[in-house]
A protein has these predicted regions:
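Conserved acidic carboxylate
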Residues: 9
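Hydrophobic/aromatic residues positioned on beta-strands within the core alpha/beta folds
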Residues: 80-81
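Two-component/phosphorelay signaling modules centered on CheY-like receiver
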Residues: 12-30
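Acidic, metal-coordinating helix/loop segments flanking the phosphotransfer/catalytic sites
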Residues: 31-49
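C-terminal output helix
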Residues: 103-112
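Active-site residues of response regulator receiver
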Residues: 53
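Short amphipathic alpha-helix used as the core "switch/output" element in two-component signaling
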Residues: 62-74
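Acidic catalytic/metal-coordinating carboxylates
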Residues: 34, 60-63
Length: 112
């Protein structure tokens, strides 16, 4: 079974770039551009890897992490931001990676 990736980011070009990257590596990939759409898709997809932006048009993605973390305890979380804000409480560990924009494909290759 293919691993699933959900990317929640309002930058359409970044989502396209990352989607193409993961499709070439044979992942099942989903993208959403708002927090509410991303949360709905999360329930449907149950991703193995979640990329979520800090600042989305309808809220702060990282604020939802404690809720998401309880729903998907086995998922790997990849937090995206143009700057490095503080981490949400109780969300640290080996399944958490912070990506500062711009994200390079070379950097992704080191993880996937």
């Amino acid at each position: 079974m293919r691993k699933k990736v959900l990317i929640i980011d309002d930058e359409v070009d970044l989502c396209k770039l990352m989607k193409n990257y993961f499709l070439r590596k044979n992942y099942e990939v989903y993208t959403e551009h708002t927090l509410s759409a991303g949360m709905n898709r999360l329930e449907e997809v149950l991703p193995d890897f979640l990329f979520i932006d800090y600042n989305l048009p309808d809220g702060l993605g990282w604020d939802k992490l404690p809720e998401i973390y309880t729903k998907l305890p086995n998922a790997h979380f990849h937090l995206i931001s143009a700057f490095r804000p503080r981490l949400p409480v109780n969300i640290e560990g080996p399944k958490l990676t912070i990506w500062e924009k711009p994200i390079s494909l070379k950097a992704l290759d080191q993880f996937f």
